Design a protein with these regions (language model features):
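A broadly conserved sequence feature marking short terminus-proximal activation segments
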Residues: 1-8, 150-154, 163-173
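Conserved Nudix-box catalytic region and its N-terminal flanking loop in Nudix hydrolases
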Residues: 2, 52-94
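Acidic, metal-coordinating catalytic segment for phosphate/diphosphate chemistry
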Residues: 2-48
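Conserved hydrophobic "DFG−1" position in protein kinase catalytic cores
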Residues: 51-52, 59, 127-129, 146
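NUDIX/MutT-family hydrolases
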Residues: 135-166
Length: 173
């Protein structure tokens, strides 16, 4: 269980009254006695595309923190109202210029090494893409490239490291 505390809201976002505390399901919850709103902290969701071709994996080189200067799978946060598969398609297109052909759920992790939030849920998909020209997203990434699965560059996120380790074992079989 993560030990990061959620935001400390003082006032109700709906009616503006001062929030109190109530115990629900054995946990302290911020609560508005005026309009009966209860704050349930949530974690964000992200998707990541594991794209493998001919023993090589497609990675992007991070341009911003956290983990600036390290490599990762093309990934991004799920926006409100968006299905994780829609996020995957959007992020792959934005970060690589490629179009998703097929995606299969590979694994789900709770990220514990994101300093920006109380962790997030990372959904990894084994992803096939249509042939096309690689196009780097200069706003988010320094570079993009195909790497030998057995000799990847430095991977930043721990969950991305786990998936890369799995891929290396899978290729050895």
């Amino acid at each position: 269980m993560l030990k990061i505390k959620p935001p400390n809201y003082q006032f109700c976002p709906f009616c503006g009254k001062k929030l109190g505390i109530k115990i629900e399901e054995g946990k302290e919850r911020k609560y508005c006695s005026s309009c009966h709103w209860t704050y349930y902290p949530r974690v964000a969701q992200a998707t990541a595309a594991v794209i493998v071709r001919k023993g090589k994996v497609l990675l992007v080189h991070r341009k911003r923190e956290p983990y600036k200067g390290t490599w990762m799978f093309p990934a991004g946060f799920v926006e409100f109202g968006e299905h994780p598969l829609e996020t995957l398609k959007r992020e792959v297109k934005e970060e690589t210029g490629l179009m998703v052909k097929k995606a299969l759920l590979m694994n789900i992790f709770q990220t514990k090494d994101d300093p920006r939030s109380p962790g997030h849920i990372a959904i990894f998909y084994r992803t096939e893409v249509l042939n096309g020209q690689l196009k780097n997203d200069d706003e988010e990434n320094q570079n993009i490239g195909w790497f030998n699965i057995q000799k990847p560059p430095k991977i930043g996120w721990k969950n991305h490291q786990k998936v890369m380790k799995f891929l290396r074992k899978e290729v050895r079989k």
